[in-house]
Amino acid sequence: MASKEIIYKEQTFKLAYELVNPSQDEVLLVLHGWGSNKEIMKQAFGNTLPDFKHIYLDMPGFGKSSNEMILNTVDYAKIVQLFLDELGVTATIAMGHSFGGKVSTLLNTPCLVLLSSAGIVTVKPWSVKVKIATFKLLKPLGMKKIRELFVAPDAQGMSHEMYETFKNVVDEDFEAEFTASKSKALCFWGKEDTATPLYTGEKIAGLIENSVFYPLDGDHFFFLTHKDFIAKTITEHCKETIQ
């Protein structure tokens, strides 16, 4: 594992990353989802796509990368781009899972690979709506441990900065960003995904002009069992984007 210090808005971020096939010229950037880290992505794809230099990055606040700022998705994309600039590389393909899919979309790489990407606002179940309403009612009273009782599972145990960041990105509508994308997009989705349901993938694929949609068996982490198919599809469909 290596690390690189990036300065963004006068704040220093120490970013942990790992390279696979470092002698290759074409670059595949792989970004994990919220609450995850580079290791699960490397586990899936580290032994695939041998013609690419893989960059597995812990985004700020995850894995072994630091974060002491309240961020939004645009901030993450700018930090990742600064990281790539610091490495002196240009990514041909950006692959992102869940939250990482939104960040990858903003990088405007020639080829974009979305794995159950976030970015489409879903209708909250009634129970969640009640929870939110109750939280808003109790918050002004200053009751202790309210945050612990009502925080989403994806945000538990986080620092204040990461919790506020989570609130910034969790229900973010990214339809305009997907529509504006000029990348060639391959959209892979788990048919049984409940975090980013299948219909959200269909919608994203419809918004990105140059896209192909692949529904596959599995849940939010379907790619762990479909890595070979995904790698083969990337090889076939992204080759014309390689300069």
Where are these regions (language model features)?
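Acidic catalytic loop of the alpha/beta-hydrolase fold
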Residues: E192-T196, F221
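Hydrophobic, aromatic-rich cap/lid helix
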Residues: E148-A176
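Short beta-strand/loop motif that positions the catalytic acidic residue
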Residues: S181, C187-W189
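Active-site loop/oxyanion-hole signature of alpha/beta-hydrolase fold enzymes
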Residues: Y56-I93, K232
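Flexible "cap/lid" loop of the alpha/beta hydrolase fold
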Residues: K102-L141
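Catalytic histidine-centered segment of alpha/beta-hydrolase-like enzymes
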Residues: D219-A231
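Conserved HGGG/HGGXW glycine-rich cap/lid loop of the alpha/beta-hydrolase fold
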Residues: L19-K64
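Alpha/beta-hydrolase fold catalytic core
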Residues: M1-L28, L49-F52, T90, Q156, ...
